[in-house]
Amino acid sequence: MPINKSEKPESCDNVKVVVRCRPLNEREKSMCYRQAVSVDEMRGTITVHKTDSSNEPPKTFTFDTVFGPESKQLDVYNLTARPIIDSVLEGYNGTIFAYGQTGTGKTFTMEGVRAVPGLRGVIPNSFAHIFGHIAKAEGDTRFLVRVSYLEIYNEEVRDLLGKDQTQRLEVKERPDVGVYIKDLSAYVVNNADDMDRIMTLGHKNRSVGATNMNEHSSRSHAIFTITIECSEKGVDGNMHVRMGKLHLVDLAGSERQAKTGATGQRLKEATKINLSLSTLGNVISALVDGKSTHVPYRNSKLTRLLQDSLGGNSKTMMCANIGPADYNYDETISTLRYANRAKNIKNKARINEDPKDALLRQFQKEIEELKKKLEEGEEVSGSDISGSEEDDEEGELGEDGEKKKKRRDQAGKKKVSPDKMVEMQAKIDEERKALETKLDMEEEERNKARAELERREKDLLKAQQEHQSLLEKLSALEKKVIVGGVDLLAKAEEQEKLLEESNMELEERRRRAEQLRKELEEKEQERLDIEEKYTSLQEEAQGKTKKLKKVWTMLMAAKSEMADLQQEHQREIEGLLENIRQLSRELRLQMLIIDNFIPQDYQEMIENYVHWNEDIGEWQLKCVAYTGNNMRKQTPVPDKKERDPFEVDLSHVYLAYTEESLRQSLMKLERPRTSKGKARPKMGRRKRSAKPETVIDSLLQ
């Protein structure tokens, strides 16, 4: 969105990364898996232990915020999502997405259990937050809120709110708008309940399946987008519009076929999911690595749509979800490494002011025009009011005849207010009564006057209908525009209250945690100072030995980290090779079909006339409208009455020496008949030929 950079400078922020660890589920407990993850919420660290190797030191990662298994949904929302949504309400773009292995609680974090207020996720809580802010705004502030919901299934973008959820949508890009989805449906909402209903509708259409690791595994990436336009009066007295977009992303989880047991369609879905997540990892790596000159956004639909969210015009928060069980050690370490890299991505967010396509401004302009029309009245022809005064001027032509006609047309349009309509109706009724009383009026004049009254009455009725239509249109537009300060919470009021109470409690806990952290640092510093003061050589030797052990532990941890990185790199290579092998099998099958059904010459012709469409990810034929059935030659239907002079009659010719063919040929040989009205000449009768059956038998013998 174009803005004045001198007035609104860009704010450079890193992507905020938080980590949430779920508790052990019933399946993991029944199979006696051990917990390998420990969470220190005060220090913001995640420590992962390798339970089958006691010699290997644990790995520790530090993030902005971490949440343990006992964390509450409201705490997660207030600490992570609330700052992003506050920025969106100020006019920034914001993105919140959950990332991690399948079955780690990404969908629970983003959606939660909407029927229970305390278990609602980020998306439902954001509804109450947004409309709570609108309800507290000043009275002269106007808001327009729109929502859309899409999914990326097998690298196909689908509209979850559209009539046909299987229709593929195209990803487009414009310099003034950025990346957008063509023909994606968006709905205007007036309260949090509307948002919740729309989300429920879209969630029912989302692709979900069962695997060995998750009974309700998401088989697609889903993006719920909320667009908030705000119009308020500035210091200059003019109305200023700003627009913020909030993308709430629920990613499908990365999978290993050996653990999920995916086969058939589920395996194909998993391959596409892993490919898109691998591209997301490559984008993160390219953004963090200062040497990379190319960021592969276009390699996947997911990264293409998140282009602004990763390294662009957006404030972004990433929630990495992990599982605590030791059998997911490799996946947990991989997720934490990706999240640790994402911390270094820098975004340049700016307020989107005065967008050219701001829908709120268009609505306000239409409302003002409609109000003006209603105040001044509808435009009707002046002949409707003044009768037939212009009849005398018809046919007035001359050098300036055209100008006079224009003047009459302009002067003939007058404004009729609702009060004037009532007066006109009364006047028409009076004239009708007067017409009925004048019995001595000639029949022709009476019919003419009656026709004039009927015409004027129709025009008046039309004006009243247009007036009513304008009122209805104005009412519909005013319903779409939400006025600040009006109580819009209804059922969401309780949820907003819960959020505020939880936020206050979190602030108090944060203050106490900061105080305890400072005290802990002071104690550690005092301990180090005491250790430095040696009273004898023996104590000094013990101190040096202790430091040497610490350094040795750090060295072993670094070696272990390097070995893990090599193993992870090897696993990624194996996964990519498996994907390549799968794609190679599909390619060989396609080539086999092509080689057996399409001649070589036509293959070369097709290859010369196809091109790759980046927007939809397909090969397309050039000038396809002029090929194939579209240009099939229309052969004229021959007239049965006309006979081709070169056509040879072969009806009496048989093509095989069978009993049936001989019988048909002999039966067709008939004597010529005379025309009607003429007697057959009397001649000597010829000897009758033998019956066809006899001839056939003799021929066959």
Swiss-Prot record:
The modification Phosphoserine is found at S689. Residues 376-399 have a biased composition (Acidic residues). It is found in: Cytoplasm, Cytoskeleton; Cell projection, Cilium; Cytoplasm, Cytoskeleton, Microtubule organizing center, Centrosome, Centriole. SUPFAM superfamilies: P-loop containing nucleoside triphosphate hydrolases. Residues 373-423, 665-701 are annotated as: Disordered. SMART domains: KISc (SM00129). The keyword Kinase does not apply. Pfam families: Kinesin (PF00225). GO terms for molecular function: ATP binding; intraciliary transport particle B binding; microtubule binding; microtubule motor activity; spectrin binding. Expressed almost exclusively in adult brain tissue (mainly in the cerebellar granular layer) within a single type of neuronal cell. Residues 599-701 are annotated as: Globular. PANTHER family: CHROMOSOME-ASSOCIATED KINESIN KIF4A-RELATED, KINESIN-LIKE PROTEIN. Belongs to the TRAFAC class myosin-kinesin ATPase superfamily. Kinesin family. Kinesin II subfamily. This is Kinesin-like protein KIF3A. It comes from Mus musculus.
